[in-house]
Amino acid sequence: MSGQGKRLMVMAGGTGGHVFPGLAVAHHLMAQGWQVRWLGTADRMEADLVPKHGIEIDFIRISGLRGKGIKALIAAPLRIFNAWRQARAIMKAYKPDVVLGMGGYVSGPGGLAAWSLGIPVVLHEQNGIAGLTNKWLAKIATKVMQAFPGAFPNAEVVGNPVRTDVLALSLPQQRLAGREGPVRVLVVGGSQGARILNQTMPQVAAKLGDSVTIWHQSGKGSQQSVEQAYAEAGQPQHKVTEFIDDMAAAYAWADVVVCRSGALTVSEIAAAGLPALFVPFQHKDRQQYWNALPLEKAGAAKIIEQPQLSVDAVANTLAGWSRETLLTMAERARAASIPDATERVANEVSRVARA
């Protein structure tokens, strides 16, 4: 499907959970001849990341309102109006055929600016419960898509766009069949690390002994303290790294993952075909719980919420999963994934642009 001469503006910012899926869709459409620009904020990760991917970025000034106090709330209408005006000027100059909102605060004024100019708005909600910005924008959007069922009552479920190297992994029955020895446990707390996992997993390792081998991503600045915790637990043999640059290789190595349940993490684990023990971040919307729930319902994962998290709870769960059980869970995870999510989102953008 050629997009020769068509123009897209992607609105996404703040976190990797918004930016990476946007980049996947952008690259897919650029390969079809689309021109793509990005709308973001200068002080968040998209400012550095997006230009590295060969995409020009325009900035507006906007930030979140939650927990900012009464003065910020009083000033909010003026700040939103100014951001809307900036976004409107950018879009009048660029003249996109369609804008794609992938979440983050930038999508709010950006979506309103597009709507006020008669430019169709396409939305993608990555989480199992809709963010505030997308809830507002859904009322004016031409098309609303969601990664997990339930964020919007009638939106099409298309999954989350996932990195191509994760999608390229061999199927779990090819990867995991015939594996022997200690169960390989990959521990991932997100790029910031998760203090609760850093504190809990060394003690879990002590309980499970040589039945497991662990690769633990500690997050920035925590590697030394986590290595020390494993050593003090009598388990110095496990591997601790601040970051894992090649997540596809880590997924290929693992038999099971212990992690938070950010939207992109859940989608990647399903696409990789891996069983998981999810410890959702305690957010007032329980966003990460709802992200993980479809995989638990599919028999591919278990959720332990943070108040119930203990060394025994994690150790007993991992000890109770035989290799046969892990393979069955891995196959269920893969079956629950939507590997063509990028194409599905891109096709809707193309369809709306042609309408």
Swiss-Prot record:
<dbReference type="InterPro" id="IPR004276">
    <property type="entry name" value="GlycoTrans_28_N"/>
</dbReference>
<dbReference type="InterPro" id="IPR007235">
    <property type="entry name" value="Glyco_trans_28_C"/>
</dbReference>
<dbReference type="GO" id="GO:0008360">
    <property type="term" value="P:regulation of cell shape"/>
</dbReference>
<keyword id="KW-0573">Peptidoglycan synthesis</keyword>
<dbReference type="GO" id="GO:0071555">
    <property type="term" value="P:cell wall organization"/>
</dbReference>
<keyword id="KW-1003">Cell membrane</keyword>
<keyword id="KW-0808">Transferase</keyword>
<dbReference type="GO" id="GO:0009252">
    <property type="term" value="P:peptidoglycan biosynthetic process"/>
</dbReference>
<dbReference type="GO" id="GO:0050511">
    <property type="term" value="F:undecaprenyldiphospho-muramoylpentapeptide beta-N-acetylglucosaminyltransferase activity"/>
</dbReference>
<comment type="pathway">
    <text>Cell wall biogenesis; peptidoglycan biosynthesis.</text>
</comment>
<keyword id="KW-0472">Membrane</keyword>
<feature type="binding site">
    <location>
        <position position="288"/>
    </location>
    <ligand>
        <name>UDP-N-acetyl-alpha-D-glucosamine</name>
    </ligand>
</feature>
<keyword id="KW-0133">Cell shape</keyword>
<feature type="binding site">
    <location>
        <position position="191"/>
    </location>
    <ligand>
        <name>UDP-N-acetyl-alpha-D-glucosamine</name>
    </ligand>
</feature>
<feature type="binding site">
    <location>
        <begin position="15"/>
        <end position="17"/>
    </location>
    <ligand>
        <name>UDP-N-acetyl-alpha-D-glucosamine</name>
    </ligand>
</feature>
<dbReference type="GO" id="GO:0051991">
    <property type="term" value="F:UDP-N-acetyl-D-glucosamine:N-acetylmuramoyl-L-alanyl-D-glutamyl-meso-2,6-diaminopimelyl-D-alanyl-D-alanine-diphosphoundecaprenol 4-beta-N-acetylglucosaminlytransferase activity"/>
</dbReference>
<feature type="binding site">
    <location>
        <position position="127"/>
    </location>
    <ligand>
        <name>UDP-N-acetyl-alpha-D-glucosamine</name>
    </ligand>
</feature>
<comment type="function">
    <text>Cell wall formation. Catalyzes the transfer of a GlcNAc subunit on undecaprenyl-pyrophosphoryl-MurNAc-pentapeptide (lipid intermediate I) to form undecaprenyl-pyrophosphoryl-MurNAc-(pentapeptide)GlcNAc (lipid intermediate II).</text>
</comment>
<feature type="binding site">
    <location>
        <begin position="263"/>
        <end position="268"/>
    </location>
    <ligand>
        <name>UDP-N-acetyl-alpha-D-glucosamine</name>
    </ligand>
</feature>
<keyword id="KW-0132">Cell division</keyword>
<feature type="binding site">
    <location>
        <position position="244"/>
    </location>
    <ligand>
        <name>UDP-N-acetyl-alpha-D-glucosamine</name>
    </ligand>
</feature>
<dbReference type="Pfam" id="PF03033">
    <property type="entry name" value="Glyco_transf_28"/>
</dbReference>
<keyword id="KW-0997">Cell inner membrane</keyword>
<keyword id="KW-0131">Cell cycle</keyword>
<dbReference type="GO" id="GO:0030259">
    <property type="term" value="P:lipid glycosylation"/>
</dbReference>
<dbReference type="InterPro" id="IPR006009">
    <property type="entry name" value="GlcNAc_MurG"/>
</dbReference>
<protein>
    <recommendedName>
        <fullName>UDP-N-acetylglucosamine--N-acetylmuramyl-(pentapeptide) pyrophosphoryl-undecaprenol N-acetylglucosamine transferase</fullName>
        <ecNumber>2.4.1.227</ecNumber>
    </recommendedName>
</protein>
<dbReference type="GO" id="GO:0005975">
    <property type="term" value="P:carbohydrate metabolic process"/>
</dbReference>
<comment type="similarity">
    <text>Belongs to the glycosyltransferase 28 family. MurG subfamily.</text>
</comment>
<dbReference type="Pfam" id="PF04101">
    <property type="entry name" value="Glyco_tran_28_C"/>
</dbReference>
<feature type="binding site">
    <location>
        <position position="163"/>
    </location>
    <ligand>
        <name>UDP-N-acetyl-alpha-D-glucosamine</name>
    </ligand>
</feature>
<keyword id="KW-0961">Cell wall biogenesis/degradation</keyword>
<dbReference type="GO" id="GO:0051301">
    <property type="term" value="P:cell division"/>
</dbReference>
<dbReference type="GO" id="GO:0005886">
    <property type="term" value="C:plasma membrane"/>
</dbReference>
<keyword id="KW-0328">Glycosyltransferase</keyword>
